[in-house]
Amino acid sequence: KMRMVSFGFAGVEPEVMGLGPIPSTEKALEKAGLSIDDIQIFELNEAFAVQVLSFLDHFNIADDDPRVNPLGGAIALGHPLAASGVRLMIQLARQFELNPAVRFGLTAMCVGLGQGGTVIWENPFFSEEQ
């Protein structure tokens, strides 16, 4: 269970294809009226490790930040064709259920040929009292 807050899709030149989630995330954040600092859990698909590292570098997030892929990413869990988006959402939904103090989470992935897709989600279990 989650509530979709906003989403963004963007494309970059194929030569830098792994960077697509950066502009898609910027679009999603702008639509939501949020900043990267409002996001408490990041589920980033890592078909290639450099994709996640580039994303983290762009947004000044440490590569060992515990908010990033806390249950493991595609390198640890696998990267089956057409299953990544569902895996990201399921992992985030479970983390929301376990962490009611977390309000916003983000799923992002490179979707091929320079495209990036990002969705910002709100935790339906959120409670400021936690």
For each predicted feature, which ranges?
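Claisen-condensing/thiolase-fold acyl-transfer catalytic domains that form or cleave C-C bonds
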Residues: 1-130
